[in-house]
Amino acid sequence: MTKRTASIKRQTTETTISLSLNLDGTGQADMCTGVRLFDHMLSQLAKHGLFDINISANGDDIHHLVEDVALTLGKAFNEALGERKGIVRMADATVPMDDSLASVALDLSGRGYAVMDLSFAKNDLTGFPTDLVRHFLETFAIEGRLNLHARILYGSNDHHKAEALFKALARALDKATSIDPRREGVAPSTKGMLEN
């Protein structure tokens, strides 16, 4: 099987990012964005999706940093998926974390789109603005060329809501990126191909 990996470096006047991704990893995470909560959430994505992800990033403000990491990570997923032949393609996951429950459904269709139903009681999670959770997911979906529906069903602790959401994303991505041996070498589409 061809290695499904990507390495991307991105440098702008606002951010500097170096990222590597292995879709067929073991959940190894090395995150260094300078934002501890963001590193924690990105680590959930690696650990529970069984992806090996290394990210080194810094930026002039948290909004630019989160946006550009999402953009770069989305591009890495798209690149690592290649022509998307043999993948399961569509998957969903519902994940609890104590008081909170989150659900993610996605389609690695080659068309970026995001629908969000997220609510947080506060505007900030220990220095991480909660609106950036939505922005991260939307940017990741568009750049990763996947259709993403994400929902926080309920919860009383904002940290738990966000963590359940990232874990649900990880589990759904793990399933959708998996190779189905019955589809080996074939795009999972009646069109015979998926956009990439």
Curated annotation (Swiss-Prot):
Gene3D superfamilies hit by this protein: Imidazole glycerol phosphate dehydratase, domain 1
Keyword annotations of the record: Amino-acid biosynthesis, Cytoplasm, Histidine biosynthesis, Lyase
Subcellular location(s) per record: Cytoplasm
Annotated Gene Ontology cellular component terms: cytoplasm
GO term, biological process aspect, one: L-histidine biosynthetic process
Major localisation: cytoplasm
Gene Ontology molecular function, alphabetical: imidazoleglycerol-phosphate dehydratase activity
Name of one Pfam family that matches: IGPD
Catalysed conversion reaction: D-erythro-1-(imidazol-4-yl)glycerol 3-phosphate = 3-(imidazol-4-yl)-2-oxopropyl phosphate + H2O
Record-listed E.C. numbers: 4.2.1.19
Taxonomy, superkingdom: Bacteria
Pathway connected to this protein: Amino-acid biosynthesis; L-histidine biosynthesis; L-histidine from 5-phospho-alpha-D-ribose 1-diphosphate: step 6/9
Signal peptide: none
Family per similarity comment: Belongs to the imidazoleglycerol-phosphate dehydratase family.
Name of the protein this chain belongs to: Imidazoleglycerol-phosphate dehydratase
